[in-house]
Amino acid sequence: MKKFFFAVAALVLPCVLVSNAFAADREHTLKVYNWADYIDMNVLNGFPAWYYEQTGEQVEVLYQTFDINESMLTEIEIGQEDYDVICPSEYIIERMLRNKLLQPINKNFGNTPDYTKLVSPFAVDKFQQMAPDTNTCVADYTVGYMWGTTGILYNTALVNQEEILSLGGLQNEKFAGKVFMKDAFRDIYSVVVLYAYREEIARGEVSRDELVANVTDERIARVEEFLTNMKNNVAGWEVDFGKEEMTKGKAWLNLSWSGDAQWAIDEAAEVGVNLEYFVPKEGSNVWFDGWCIPIYAKNTKAASYFINYMCMPQNAILNMEEIGYVSVVASPEILEWANDEEVEETSNLTYFFGEGAEAVHANHGFYPDQSGIERCALMHDCGDKTEDMLAMWSRVKGDNLSAGLVVFILIVMAVIVFTIIIRTVNNKRQQKMRQNKKRNRRR
């Protein structure tokens, strides 16, 4: 229990201190809330100087990270946290738009170029699919950051690609205890449902987009059947450690995110392990993360400039090289960066870069070719089917959460609630102090 106490204290105290320290100069503070390990810190640290050059105004960046979309959303939706810039995934952006939790990005940058215009039309079109109604232009509320696919990462010395071109190959008994699966029910559902309805897709009875966007009881049942049938092959459900197991040769296969796959491929090559990644022939999901400004943001001007800054080609390249994921920016500089002569095959990337990208020597893990991307569908919020999806996921995994992990999760939730209460009290205290000062001045 002492360890739990100190862990909770370590989580709570910084939040309380930060709340007090930054309340006084909030006007010149930019609060950025992003995924962990998802930015080049040199790019982040360079923003204040760039912002001063563009506006003549000082700003200090308060950078915080999260590991779960839902925890970030809870802080904003319930706690009314005043983060200025956040980087949610597409289904959370969809939910926040529907619940009116985002405000428009001001793209009037004066003499500063609007770098957000360099975002690929492919990404802009995909984001528009998240609109809650026909009157909403999603590009007014979010600008893409990174994107990718979910696919199969495999060890070429242990697995023949012909065996796993179809997702059904993961059910092969020879892979017993050799497959790692992402512990992400939306991502896995989006891939498996395309396999489960492959015949209906082939007959033209249903599209991939419709299958992924509209969750039904029948579709959940088919996905559950597939996952149950391959349960003996699953070595573990992971969010991060699967890629490391692949680099060590301890796992043969990993249903993985493209960015994690690329990281594993690079790391494994250094120790003589050859890994490759591809999208199953039945299709997969294409996912996006994007920058947004929540409705409780205080420094919306700096937030808008920060989003613009992140779209500068040189910054996009630095971020890609640092984190292993792919930027939505599609400028000539990015195309030049993507063209790798060491890659023998060429890909048609006109869907992303436009004319001039008909035959690019690009890494398939970074940029699927035209035929591959046509087999991918955008992941959406499950809406009122979320609980049914979670119940299915729990059955598939066997409800094997340890008591310690359950306790830890409950403590973390309590910490979040406690922190929200503390910050609310502090905010009210600051507001009351300002009101008292005004009264004193009037006297």
Language model segments and positions:
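Short beta-strand and adjacent tight-turn residues that come in two discontinuous sequence segments
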Residues: 66, 88, 181, 237, ...
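Conserved C-terminal helix/tail region of periplasmic/extracytoplasmic solute-binding proteins
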Residues: 360-443
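Extracytoplasmic/periplasmic substrate-binding proteins
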Residues: 232-296, 337
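Mature extracytoplasmic/periplasmic domains
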Residues: 294-373, 442
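Early extracytoplasmic/lumenal segment of secretory-pathway proteins
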Residues: 23-99, 401-404
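Sec-dependent N-terminal signal peptides of Gram-positive bacterial secreted proteins and lipoproteins
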Residues: 4-22, 416-421
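Pocket-flanking alpha-helical
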Residues: 45, 67-104, 114-138, 262-268
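Extracytoplasmic ligand-binding site segments that recognize negatively charged/polar headgroups
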Residues: 33, 38-41, 97-250
